Amino acid sequence: MALQGWLESLKAAQKTCILQDGRRKVHFLFTDGKEMAEEYDAKSHELIVRKWRQKSGLGAYGQWQIEVGDPPLPGAGTIQPDFLKESSSNPTFTRKDTKSSFQWRIRNLPYPKEVYSVTVDKKDRCCIIRTTNKKYYKKFSIPDLDRCHLDLNENAISFAHANNTLVVTYEKPKEILSIEEELQREVKSMKATTDGDVECKTQ
């Protein structure tokens, strides 16, 4: 069963934990060589960041791919002319979950709520945001459901719009809540170091 398989992968992964800047940072090294790093609020235990990376065929680590949390700023760490920088008025797509739902925020969308539609494509296993004025279109998957081979549910998705931000919410199925609860128990039981700015790593 895929659901049980993902849970077993989490349990079998090498894990290290560090408390830093009010966050519990957990690093997972899976048996296939992939790495996952998660950051939780140390008080509320809500997930703030989840990112992945894996080695290339040459053995070099690739860049971290953000799954949950704010993506790095365009051009962060590089110097580039102003005319090459991404406009701050462009829509930005960010996933920020709550304990009961997956949630995405698309900022810089000034159109009224009635312009938007959010649907589920079960065949392609993705959610689709459309606008009647053809100004915005976005397809995105829910990796958590893919990892557990869980079907998308049209009734679980909803959206709201305020302050130029579209908020799309997908209620977590009970299977995901069960896995997250079990993972939280394991994470909370881990001995966390508090050694300053040392990044969580598994040797």
From Swiss-Prot:
Stored Pfam families: DPCD
Highest rank taxon of the organism: Eukaryota
InterPro entries: DPCD
Family listed: Belongs to the DPCD family.
PANTHER family, per the entry: PROTEIN DPCD
Name of the protein this chain belongs to: Protein DPCD
Organism: Xenopus laevis
